[in-house]
Amino acid sequence: MSRVFAYCRVSTLEQTTENQRREIEAAGFAIRPQRLIEEHISGSVAASERPGFIRLLDRMENGDVLIVTKLDRLGRNAMDIRKTVEQLASSDIRVHCLALGGVDLTSAAGRMTMQVISAVAEFERDLLLERTHSGIARAKATGKRFGRPSALNEEQQLTVIARINAGISISAIAREFNTTRQTILRVKAGQQSS
């Protein structure tokens, strides 16, 4: 007979897994206390690196069932979640996600659901990258500068270029402006590329 386990995770110590436990009970699952793993750890940590999840994997056997309230309990992103579900499926452990109607993620329908979710996540990631690149290009076109401010203002940079053209050493110029040689070399390189 299949044993039923539950994995509940929250990100901070101020949060509680109580709502997740109640949701699992309301769905009709009576989880024994020793089969309920509760963890306070950031969702940005891969499931394979979470102490509680590792303990859960050590306790589970072929034919067991794992219940989670939401997919994000199983990993930090779509790829991590898929890897976790595949790892569990390879051990013949079924995974049910209540937020997806209790579908078994290791079944054909569950795998299809996972593929759709992965595709949507990839699409969202691509859109975010596209918007980021577009925003950077727009900012550059309006003259926005990126990075930290220059150590030397425009007037100082013009003086540095004049000193370089006069044959004064880079080290002497750096000492004069109380800055690094690298800063003076950057001013020189910027002047040469203009």
Curated annotation (Swiss-Prot):
PROSITE patterns: RECOMBINASES_1, RECOMBINASES_2, RECOMBINASES_3
Annotated active site: S11
GO BP term (any one): DNA integration
Highest taxon, organism lineage: Bacteria
Molecular function, one GO term: DNA strand exchange activity
CDD domains named among the record's database cross-references: HTH_Hin_like (cd00569), SR_ResInv (cd03768)
Residue ranges of every copy of the Resolvase/invertase-type recombinase catalytic domain listed in the record: 3-143
Coiled-coil intervals: none
Keyword DNA-binding: yes
Gene3D superfamilies xrefs: Homeodomain-like (1.10.10.60), Resolvase, N-terminal catalytic domain (3.40.50.1390)
DNA-binding region: 170-189
One Pfam family hit: Resolvase
Calcium in keyword set: no
UniProt KW keywords: DNA integration, DNA recombination, DNA-binding, Transposable element
Misc remark: Tn2501 is a cryptic class II transposon found as part of the lactose transposon Tn951.
Family: Belongs to the site-specific recombinase resolvase family.
Function as written in the Swiss-Prot or TrEMBL entry: Resolvase catalyzes the resolution (a site-specific recombination) of the cointegrated replicon to yield the final transposition products.
Record protein name field: Transposon Tn2501 resolvase
Annotated organism of origin: Escherichia coli
Gene: tnpR
